[in-house]
C-alpha cells in the first residue's frame, strides 16, 4: 500500500518544537530543537505525493513550559511545582495562557503546510500524586471535563480559522 498520511512530531513529549515555526513564546522559553532541518522541503515533497500531513502537538505534558512559566504549571499544596512519577512537570489545563500557546503552535503548523493538528496528552496527569495538586482559583468553578472540553473547543476554533483540521487524543 502507498503512504497517504504522515504524522510528524511538531511539539514532542519533552515540550520541544521539532521544526522551525513562527511561535514567539517557544523561542522566548527556549523550547526549539529543530530536528527537522528543512520543513518547507518536507512539506512540498509530501504535497507532491498527495500525503496528508498531521502535526502532532503534545498538549499539557510540557515540562519546558511548566518550568519556564511556573505560574502556568500545576502546583502541589505546598506551592512547589507538581512532578509526575517520571519527574516531569505538567502545565495547568485550566490556564487560558496555556491554551493560547498550544493553539499558536497548531496555527503555525497549519500555516507551515500541515493539513491537521493532532493534539496529544489532552488530559490531566493520571499520576496518583495529582491528589496533592492545588488548582487554586484557576478552576473558576469548572470541572476537569469542562477544562479539557473548553481547550478543545478553543483550539478547534483557532485551527479551523487557520484553514486546518483538528483531532485530539484524550485518555
Model-derived features with residue positions:
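A mature extracytoplasmic/lumenal domain signature
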Residues: 10-14, 21-23, 57-59, 121-123, ...
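The substrate-binding groove and active-site-proximal loops of carbohydrate-active enzymes
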Residues: 22-36, 86-100, 138-146
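Glycine-rich, aromatic-flanked loop segments that form ligand/cofactor-binding clefts
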Residues: 5-8, 37-82, 118
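Active-site-adjacent "subsite" loops/lids of carbohydrate-active enzymes
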Residues: 60-111
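Catalytic domains of carbohydrate-active enzymes, especially glycoside hydrolases
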Residues: 1-16, 108-118
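Aromatic-lined carbohydrate-recognition surfaces of secreted/lumenal glycan-active proteins
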Residues: 52-62, 118-119, 142-171
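Aromatic- and glycine-enriched glycan-recognition loops and surfaces
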Residues: 1, 28-50, 143-153
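Aromatic- and acidic-residue-enriched segments that line the glycan-binding/catalytic groove
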Residues: 18-30, 62-84, 125-139
Amino acid at each position: 500500500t502507498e503512504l497517504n498520511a504522515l504524522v510528524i512530531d511538531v511539539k514532542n513529549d519533552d515540550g520541544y518544537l521539532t521544526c522551525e515555526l513562527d511561535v514567539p513564546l517557544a523561542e522566548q522559553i527556549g523550547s526549539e530543537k529543530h530536528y527537522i532541518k528543512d520543513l518547507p522541503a518536507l512539506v512540498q515533497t509530501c504535497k507532491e505525493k498527495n500525503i496528508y500531513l498531521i502535526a502532532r502537538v503534545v498538549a499539557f505534558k510540557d515540562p519546558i513550559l511548566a518550568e519556564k512559566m511556573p505560574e502556568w504549571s500545576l502546583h502541589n499544596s505546598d506551592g512547589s511545582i507538581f512532578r509526575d512519577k517520571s519527574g516531569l512537570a505538567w502545565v495547568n489545563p485550566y490556564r487560558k495562557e496555556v491554551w493560547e500557546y498550544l493553539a499558536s503552535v497548531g496555527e503555525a503548523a497549519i500555516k507551515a503546510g500541515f493539513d491537521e493538528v493532532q493534539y496529544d496528552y489532552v488530559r490531566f496527569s493520571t499520576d496518583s500524586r495529582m491528589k496533592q495538586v492545588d488548582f487554586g482559583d484557576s478552576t473558576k468553578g469548572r470541572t476537569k471535563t469542562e477544562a479539557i472540553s473548553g481547550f478543545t473547543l478553543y483550539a478547534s476554533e483557532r485551527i479551523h480559522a487557520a484553514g486546518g483540521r483538528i483531532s485530539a487524543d484524550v485518555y
